[in-house]
Amino acid sequence: MIRIDKRSNVDLRPVKITRKYLKYPLGSVLIEMGETKVICTVSMEEKVPPFLKGTNQGWLTAEYGMLPGSTPERKVRDVVKGVINGRSQEIQRLIGRSLRAVIDFSKLGERTIWIDTDVIQADGGTRTAAITGAFVALYDALEKLKRDGVIKEIPIKEFVAAVSVGIVDGEILLDLSANEDMRAEVDMNVVMTESGKFVEIQGTAEKTPFTYEQLQQMLNLAKQGIMKLIEIQKKALGLL
């Protein structure tokens, strides 16, 4: 099929990661995946949740939100509604799980890392972009903490990134745009570490059930995309 942006079925959208995007956070990134743009910031508190007190273990938690102008129709802020909508809750928990999977909290001490992800323009794949960008911001933040003598070493076990895959008009596609996502028969988000371990797979048949063989094909394509994203992360961090 011919995609709107002329990509092949197996191509990512253009990815740009701008580090140190904001002045005040420990780490900050603007990640752009096609027309999707997400600001990811990292802050730290010198305390942990009650269940971790006295353990010398750290913690990480995440928040996710979409600015009113991030979508074609104005999106009402959760603070105005007085409640976080279910989708945002699901996504911020996913972001937290994804990043906790690659952190050695015994090396962080009793500190809490806060990840804040704010979508400033949504064109599909906001949760996967948030995970991919937040990891880079987290790496920068932990590197600064090490440089400042707050921690002895960067407690990252390995890199992690995320991407969407799906079936649109019977064809398997990587990194769906909003237009493709709306038309998808199957929509899937995959989070994976650099060593090829899955952190999360979210897959739904929106219109047509999918086969085991199609599942394997989608996971293989997602892995290819994630390995490319990890390469982009490393280049952004100056590690390649």
Curated annotation (Swiss-Prot):
EC primary class: transferase
Single Gene Ontology MF annotation: tRNA nucleotidyltransferase activity
Keyword Cell division applies: no
Catalyzed reaction equations: tRNA(n+1) + phosphate = tRNA(n) + a ribonucleoside 5'-diphosphate
Gene3D superfamilies, sorted: GHMP Kinase, N-terminal domain
EC numbers: 2.7.7.56
Gene Ontology annotations of biological process type: rRNA catabolic process; rRNA processing; tRNA processing
Keyword annotations from UniProtKB, A to Z: Nucleotidyltransferase, RNA-binding, rRNA processing, Transferase, tRNA processing, tRNA-binding
Binding site for phosphate: 87, 125-127
Family: Belongs to the RNase PH family.
Known function: Phosphorolytic 3'-5' exoribonuclease that plays an important role in tRNA 3'-end maturation. Removes nucleotide residues following the 3'-CCA terminus of tRNAs; can also add nucleotides to the ends of RNA molecules by using nucleoside diphosphates as substrates, but this may not be physiologically important. Probably plays a role in initiation of 16S rRNA degradation (leading to ribosome degradation) during starvation.
Assembly description: Homohexameric ring arranged as a trimer of dimers.
Name assigned to this protein: Ribonuclease PH
Gene name per UniProt: rph
